[in-house]
Curated annotation (Swiss-Prot):
Function (record text): Core component of RNA polymerase II (Pol II), a DNA-dependent RNA polymerase which synthesizes mRNA precursors and many functional non-coding RNAs using the four ribonucleoside triphosphates as substrates.
SUBUNIT field: Component of the RNA polymerase II (Pol II) core complex consisting of 12 subunits: a ten-subunit catalytic core composed of POLR2A/RPB1, POLR2B/RPB2, POLR2C/RPB3, POLR2I/RPB9, POLR2J/RPB11, POLR2E/RPABC1, POLR2F/RPABC2, POLR2H/RPABC3, POLR2K/RPABC4 and POLR2L/RPABC5 and a mobile stalk composed of two subunits POLR2D/RPB4 and POLR2G/RPB7, protruding from the core and functioning primarily in transcription initiation. Part of Pol II(G) complex, in which Pol II core associates with an additional subunit POLR2M; unlike conventional Pol II, Pol II(G) functions as a transcriptional repressor.
Gene assigned in the entry: Polr2j
Keywords: Acetylation, DNA-directed RNA polymerase, Nucleus, Transcription
Protein name in UniProt: DNA-directed RNA polymerase II subunit RPB11
PANTHER family the UniProt entry points to: DNA-DIRECTED RNA POLYMERASE I,II,III, DNA-DIRECTED RNA POLYMERASE II SUBUNIT RPB11
Length: 117
């Protein structure tokens, strides 16, 4: 079989960076964020969060090839707002939202278990 070993889809090799940032020379005020060992799950949620920011003009992602375990997120912002700042803010907001979701989920489980007993 030509498929790579399953562990290659999530394990970073020695010297491999999780995220690399490259300036997009085709478009003003834009960057390409390459995230290794991730797929559509993270790409779509980050893109959606970036698009909630009014200073983000464009946000999109692609998976270069199904056997390559990485996503490339392209972000273009207004001139007074850097793509790196937009990306950092989106990640911070997502962490907050997911922490709140986890807290509510755990509370609902606890309430349900107390109701059963």
């Amino acid at each position: 079989m030509n498929a790579p070993p399953a562990f290659e889809s999530f394990l970073l090799f020695e010297g491999e960076k999780k995220i690399t940032i490259n300036k997009d020379t085709k478009v003003p005020n834009a960057c390409l964020f390459t995230i290794n060992k991730e797929d559509h799950t993270l790409g779509n949620i980050i893109k959606s969060q970036l698009l909630k920011d009014p200073q983000v003009l464009f946000a999109g992602y692609k998976v270069p090839h199904p056997l390559e375990h990485k996503i490339i997120i392209r972000v273009q912002t207004t001139p007074d707002y850097s793509p790196q700042e937009a990306f950092t803010n989106a990640i911070t907001d997502l962490i907050s939202e997911l922490s709140l979701l986890e807290e509510r989920f755990r509370g609902a489980i606890k309430d349900k278990q107390e109701g059963i007993e």
